[in-house]
């Protein structure tokens, strides 16, 4: 059935986005509309955006992945070790990316086995994985950072195409790929059905355990992509980087229309939510407002949006 504007999540997000743009345009027209400000937003959004997509993948099937930050840090440490241990070159670059992807697949498979195979609660399984990975990351590095990467790692963060940072293009490609996966593929349909009712989906002939395994592997691989972007941006890798992204990624997913109980959500809504959060953060930074107040505003925004979902029936908007 066609959705009306009243239960269309994207409609409200566009309204909030326009409201924020108008407010910041009035408060600081010259700075807010500067090219450097929008390039700054475009450079900051990809890491958070890809991590939020990694979180959303698991929430769509009724789960959650609390280990996304620990997974990203583990992958970045593995890639950092390979990139700094061997001479720069095509073989080293390929080995670095394969090592990060391999580490992500192992972590994703472990989460998938715990959740789909052993039937551990997603929140407990990924919380345990997060704690395990953080401990291993700190143990291996001693809490210190691995830095001073070769130029080919740093190139990604500085490269632009049509004036837009290359990481933003990479985020767009990842988001478009996930949209195709969720909207046009049998796997995407199965993910949504599992989120709505896993038992009924199983009895309908779907291999729900295999689907859940794929979900957590894809989530981990997205973390590896975010990890490489963090490496390129920060020129270092550390066990404790990006910890504030965990709650913000959940916020972006829910604000973007992903049902925390699973079964509904759209990539378009998530992208709009990410733009909204980044514009708020950028505007507050320019105004010199404390980042803690920004975080508090995000919390208020989430609570208000949850209330709106209940009042306007947005929870039924898939």
Give residue spans per PLM region.
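Transmembrane helix-bundle core of multi-pass membrane transporters
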Residues: 118, 122-185, 211-214, 233-242, ...
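Single transmembrane alpha-helix segments in multi-pass membrane proteins
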Residues: 22-28, 33-87, 113-119, 254-267, ...
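Alpha-helical transmembrane segments within multi-pass membrane transporters and channels
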Residues: 87-129, 173, 272-273
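Helix-loop-helix "hairpin" substructures at the membrane interface of multi-pass membrane proteins
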Residues: 92-100, 106-111, 163-237
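Inter-helical junctions in multi-pass inner-membrane proteins, predominant
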Residues: 30-40, 137-140, 182-183, 188, ...
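Hydrophobic core segments of alpha-helical transmembrane domains in multi-pass membrane transport
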Residues: 13-25, 55, 101-104, 130-135, ...
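Transmembrane alpha-helical segments in multi-pass inner-membrane proteins
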Residues: 223, 233-299
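Cytosolic-side transmembrane-helix boundaries in multi-pass membrane proteins
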Residues: 1-23, 176, 196, 202-210, ...
